Amino acid sequence: MKLTIVGGGSTYTPELIDGFSRHPELDLTEIHLVDPDAHRVELVAGVSRRMLARAGHPARVVAGNDLVAGVADADFVLLQLRVGGQATRQQDETWPHDVHCIGQETTGPGGFAKALRTVPQVLSIAETVRTHARPGTWIIDFTNPVGIVTRALLEAGHQAVGLCNVAIGFQRRFAAALGVHPDEIGLGHVGLNHLTWERSVVVDGQDRLPGMLAERLGDLADEVELAPALLAQLGMVPSYYLRYYYAHDEVLAEQLREPTRAEA
């Protein structure tokens, strides 16, 4: 199976490679990294090859900046690009402050600005996938803002799914707190990326969330940096991204005195 990663020069790529190396059942034979920065993608490809070799994984890693060659005969195409790089991220995280809004690249005005730059590029890439990849190839979107980008892909008729690590992060944290394997956790995960809530945590057919809210309310609130009283009132655990709304003024004050994520 061939997987193409568009934005393969990203620092997130080694994390993906680590995950693939621990799941040989995926039967990956080729990982093709595509990125406009040829030097950067070759560096990431070298790291990726060493990681796979250390894990004994047989997949070969190919790198380049030719999108057509990259997606040719691909079974899956994963998108993790940032149009304009960290410079535009810095803009998205700062200009909203001028109008008393949170600066963030997935939600709010910064997220919409990023969507305006990103959606046209993603749709262009998707058309290349439609033309040159295998019939039925899935596009997997990690590119933010995930909800808007994935919706654009679907409305254009592409076979696509948008992924976010919020749900699996909660699944793992709840599993650790309850002393069970993550696969035993069934989440009632509702909302749109990244604005989601966990409204149930089911283990062996029983919802354990009410008990967790009663016994671990402070810990759960600390995880998402929100007031315990809010979680108790909701009866759910919000994504930490919802802090930008539930605690808008507090977060804005923090952003004005701290480095942005792009700077960090």
What are the residue ranges of the model-derived segments?
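NAD(P)-binding Rossmann-fold cofactor-contacting core
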Residues: E25-M51
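N-terminal Rossmann-like dinucleotide-binding module
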Residues: K2-I31
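Redox-cofactor binding/interface segments in oxidoreductases and associated redox assembly factors
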Residues: A72, L78-L79, D141
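Rossmann-fold NAD(P)-binding glycine/threonine-rich loop
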Residues: V83, A87-A156
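The conserved SAM/SAH-binding core of class I Rossmann-like methyltransferase domains
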Residues: V6, V34, L163
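Short acidic low-complexity segments
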Residues: R60-D73
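Long, compositionally biased stretches enriched for glycine and/or charged residues
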Residues: G179-A264
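Rossmann-fold dinucleotide-binding core
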Residues: P14, W138, F142-G205
